[in-house]
Amino acid sequence: MSLHFHGLNYYSKQPQRLFDFYKTLGLNVVQEKESDDYFGAALALSDQKEPVIWIWSIPDGKEQSCCNNLYFTTGGKVMEVYETIRAAGIDCPEPVKTFWGGTELTVTDPDGNTILFL
């Protein structure tokens, strides 16, 4: 059996805010659908051949599940990623050195989901 990871679903009571946040991080919009009673969008690093993040509305009366975690490897360029995120106007803590010698940057999106850059 061969499996291929295709993406993540994020559900939000404020999907436009979450959508804008991930666009600011540099993810590309590969699909977008919006109307009065529906919000769905997909973002990816480059195109739909890579895993995507789908953002959906949480229907009224439903609870938001928290917290999702997303991980990116940076090829040793955590500081460059940090500077790019700060230049985009996103407030985040400085990267930290881990006990094993690596560097990590943790960013929290508007819904409390964490994004870890290694």
Which residues make up each language-model segment?
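Vicinal oxygen chelate
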Residues: H4-K13, E32-K33, A41-A44, D60-L118
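Absolute protein N-terminus
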Residues: M1-S2, L118
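Core segments of cupin and vicinal oxygen chelate
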Residues: S2, N9-E50
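Short, charged/polar, Gly/Pro-enriched secondary-structure boundary elements
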Residues: Q48-I53, D111-I115
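Acetyl-CoA-dependent GNAT
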Residues: I55-D60, E94, T98
